[in-house]
Amino acid sequence: MKRLCIIFIIILCITSGCSWKTNQPPIANSMPQEMPGDFNFMVRFGYGEVTKNEINSYEDQVVKDLINKGTATADITLTTEEMHSIYKKMYEMNVMGMKDVAFTGSNCSKIPYNEDNWKITVDGEMKSLTWSDQHCDVTSEADQLLKLRKFIQQIVETKEAYKELPEAEGGYE
């Protein structure tokens, strides 16, 4: 009986380390390491369906949500150095290989919620990505996109043309 218990424990120990799920290998980064000449992006963001804020390198424009006062637009061109630093971050997170950005499987719901819509062009390929925190949790990829957007926002907010835009009035509930 002892022998049977020992064999059972050994088998249990061996099989407990195994899993039916296989770890997916990371998607190979197909982005060129150096920033291509056609690299551009646009991100719209805000609360829920009110994604009035926009940073658009295709059009060299920024739109600021003024809440009760509508929106204001400024012509802002990011420098080559700034575009390189943004591209480097996108390359490091393999943004063109991202897939399930929005899905978390959470049953939670909250209002208001953040939402970002991205359009990115790299080396002739265009990628659209959307995520929100409406269902409370976000994927790790969505979290990376949020950090990237905040990084880009910090760059934009240092620009004189952005500083000259009116302040927002009011708030979202």
Describe every region a protein language model picked out:
Residues M1-L4:
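Positively charged n-region of N-terminal signal peptides that target proteins for export
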Residues I76-E81, T139-A142:
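Soluble non-cytosolic domains of exported or imported proteins
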Residues S19-R44, F103-E173:
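Short, well-ordered, aromatic-rich surface patches in folded extracellular/luminal domains
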Residues D60-A74, L129-D133:
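Acidic/histidine-rich, surface-exposed loop or edge segments in extracytoplasmic proteins
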Residues T22-A28, T80-N107:
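Charged, amphipathic alpha-helical segments
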